């Protein structure tokens, strides 16, 4: 899994590429939590995500709970 981060003022965008599974979910969680201070909009670009496991979904739920307190979270380019 590769993560490209872009931060503009209070918006943090993570473009994720590859698989989010039990091996890579902790990396995603660490990357998310490292830059959330002062962020009011978290954007996750799933255009290049091939797979997400329940461990990855847990990380997303945790991020959503945090963002509910300080702003909003948006998922983009999610496949069906």
Predicted feature residues:
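STAS-typified acidic loop motif
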Residues: 2-30, 47-48
């Amino acid at each position: 899994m590769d993560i490209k981060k872009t931060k503009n003022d209070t918006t943090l965008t993570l473009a994720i590429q590859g698989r989010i599974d039990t091996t890579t979910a902790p990396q995603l969680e660490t990357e998310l939590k490292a830059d959330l201070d002062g962020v009011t909009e978290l954007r996750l670009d799933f255009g290049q995500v091939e797979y997400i496991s329940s461990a990855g979904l847990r990380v997303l739920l945790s991020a959503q709970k945090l963002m509910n307190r300080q702003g909003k979270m948006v998922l983009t380019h999610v496949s069906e």
